[in-house]
Amino acid sequence: MSLSSGGWTPTPGFTPDQSAALPTHYGASQSQLGCQTVLMSVRVSVCHSGIRPLCLPGAGDESLRLQLSMDPGKSGEFRLSLQDSSGTGRSVTIAEFDLGTVNYEVKSPKCHELSLVAPPHDRISFNFRCEQEAQEWATVVLSSLREAQRVAPQDNGPQRPLDGLNLQNTMILQRTEETCIELTRAIEAGDMQAASAFAATLARQHATLKIQPSAGEYEDTEISLAVVVEDSSSSCCVTVKVFPHMTTAALKQQMFLEYGFHPRVQRWVIGQCLCTDQRSLASYGVHQDGDTAFLYLLSARHARLTLQVLQQDQESALLLSSPSLSLPTPPLPATSANGPSSLDQRPYTTLPPRLHTSSSTERRNISEIKDLINLEMPQLNEALSPNTASTQGWSCPSCTYINKPTRPGCEICSTNRPENYIIPGGYRPDQLELRRIQQEKEAIRQYQQAREEERRENFARLVMMDSQDLLPNPEPVDCRICYMDLQPGEGVLLRECLHCFCRECLRSVIMLSEEPEVSCPYRDDTYSCACSLQEREIRALVPAEEYERWLQRGLSVAESRCEGSYHCATPDCLGWCVYEDTVNVFHCPVCRKHNCLICKSIHEGMNCKQYQDDLAARAINDSAARRTTQLLKTLVQSGEAMHCPQCGIIVQKRDGCDWLRCTVCHTEICWVTRGPRWGPKGPGDTSGGCRCNVNNQKCHPKCQNCH
């Protein structure tokens, strides 16, 4: 007898000596390998917990082995046995279990536990020598256990003939499939009436269907999809080869195989849409090389993903993706709304259901399976290992994406190409790159053309605006003088400072100004505009008489401020000139008189000597002239009058502050210091003049606001 799952089963092949060495309540047998194929065998030490002792007299830990075998002629027939090879030279089966009715659990990296499903629920703990051997054993046993559990319901007994109910179900299924085929044909032909009838028939049957476009509707060309992978703390960019007809679920499975990201933690965003598993990539706009998708990774806790589930799914994915197994890849647990599924049951297909009886073929398939299982995550290691192949192109310093040599910026994050990168001399761009270069040249040409057109339009607009004497306000504003609301075009926009006022206010400012330069009237609590109105703006704002008066005021100020100026001696004449060393006579263009610049008078018909003699003679006999001269000298000597420091005429202060201005040269004078108020550069120049209020000091103790 030998221990099996759920009880004791007879096992032939014991010798009388071997049977005598075992307890009466425990049976041992020799392993029968004539019809069994051994998948894997490892050395273990055993710790048994149950109502029956599990031991063999004289057997040590070094002689115990766990052995997994299968029957090539029966699908899902796996046997797990505990062998002893001490002393006798032959392996003796201590215990043997049907793998389909036991539970196997990984307790720690070097400790596994087996328990019986049926009473008395014995438990056996196996301790392995190294972690790698324990991991390889767990991979094979767990995969075989799932295969045995999947096949078990199909092998409960011999198949019975179909009864009436099964026959009826078969007929219903046939009619449903035929209706689906007819519905497909009606939709392809565009027959709306027939399609509606077939759809109604299926709806009455409550048929469970899966409808999706045919693969022929998509382009069957493999493309490169740029994937930006991000989690809560980091991000990177990878390139994945995909087909447009692939679904999001297939893309998740591919990323799981290549990079180890479980489908439960994957969230895909393409074209600002959260992708669902059933839709294809083409439905989100993925059609050509370089299209971008974003993959956001959740935490395992948020996705309710355990380490055991991850390892099981990795083992299944690696086994199913191997070409040697030649089996279709079933999907991993379905996700709803791009999230984790609440179901833990998932289909598995690990080993081939039936192996050929030929010894050479059997040995080849077994070795292929063992080679596949002995590799520790081969696809993941290859996918995550750095690519050692030499690739032409430059690596982005920000996202590490490998770009084509001629690309000026990163295709993913638009970072500029490193300045020290040199395009290889013998590099030849491919067709896609040549098209991109041509598109860039065309884009640059169009940009330059649009920019030149914009410059021409701006220049034409500026020329048109410059031809206008007054610029109207382009938007509603308030006049800062009269506070009237000005609609677009009702006000005047000053060219120098872009301040806007109404026409009447600007006209009043010009007419009341005593200076030849009319300043902008804008004032507020913190700012005073220092710009001036242009001559053409003044000409367009005031009448012709006021404009002439403004021009004459400017000439008068220019004459008074000019050191070498001379005014025509004719009464009420506005003509004047500037002294020159070689010119002694000024021909006035206003009154047409000839002024002697030496005598500073008009003495036509007399030379300078004759005129001076005549003037001296008239001064002796003219008593009025003598009294006037004597009065002016007395005023100057008494301090009631003074000579202008610029032109020398006599000026007099009547009342008020100590500031006054010469009526001839318009020089600002400080009365208390008897000198100019400002320096040679005019108003604001404190390098000369009386320097009043410089360093908070008055120019004179008796100063009465000369500023």
Curated annotation (Swiss-Prot):
SUPFAM superfamilies tied to this protein: PH domain-like, Ran binding protein zinc finger-like, RING/U-box, Ubiquitin-like
Domain of life: Eukaryota
Zinc finger boundaries on the chain: IBR-type: 548-608
Any single GO BP term: proteasome-mediated ubiquitin-dependent protein catabolic process
Keyword Lipid biosynthesis listed: no
Pathway given in the UniProt record: Protein modification; protein ubiquitination
Zinc finger map (RanBP2-type): 390-419
UniProt feature, compositional bias: Polar residues: 338-348
Catalytic site positions: 657
Zinc finger map (RING-type): 479-529, 644-673
E.C. code: 2.3.2.31
Residues the record lists as binding Zn(2+) 5: 644, 647, 662, 665
Region span, TRIAD supradomain: 475-703
UniProt cross-references to Pfam families, sorted A to Z: LTM, Sharpin_PH, Zn_ribbon_RanBP
Domain Ubiquitin-like: 223-286
UniProt catalytic activity: [E2 ubiquitin-conjugating enzyme]-S-ubiquitinyl-L-cysteine + [acceptor protein]-L-lysine = [E2 ubiquitin-conjugating enzyme]-L-cysteine + [acceptor protein]-N(6)-ubiquitinyl-L-lysine
Gene3D superfamilies per the UniProt record, alphabetical: Phosphatidylinositol 3-kinase Catalytic Subunit, Chain A, domain 1, Pleckstrin-homology domain (PH domain)/Phosphotyrosine-binding domain (PTB), Zinc/RING finger domain, C3HC4 (zinc finger), Zn-finger domain of Sec23/24
Annotated binding of Zn(2+) 2, by residue: 497, 499, 520, 529
Residues given in the record as Zn(2+) 3 binding sites: 568, 573, 588, 591
Residues involved in Zn(2+) 1 binding: 479, 482, 502, 505
GO molecular function, one term: ubiquitin binding
Domain comment quoted from the record: The RanBP2-type zinc finger, also called Npl4 zinc finger (NZF), mediates binding to 'Met-1'-linked polyubiquitins.
Subunit relationships: Component of the LUBAC complex (linear ubiquitin chain assembly complex).
Function: Component of the LUBAC complex which conjugates linear ('Met-1'-linked) polyubiquitin chains to substrates and plays a key role in NF-kappa-B activation and regulation of inflammation. LUBAC conjugates linear polyubiquitin to ikbkg and RIPK1 and is involved in activation of the canonical NF-kappa-B and the JNK signaling pathways. Linear ubiquitination mediated by the LUBAC complex interferes with TNF-induced cell death and thereby prevents inflammation.
Family as reported in the entry's similarity comment: Belongs to the RBR family.
Name of the protein described by the UniProt record: RanBP-type and C3HC4-type zinc finger-containing protein 1
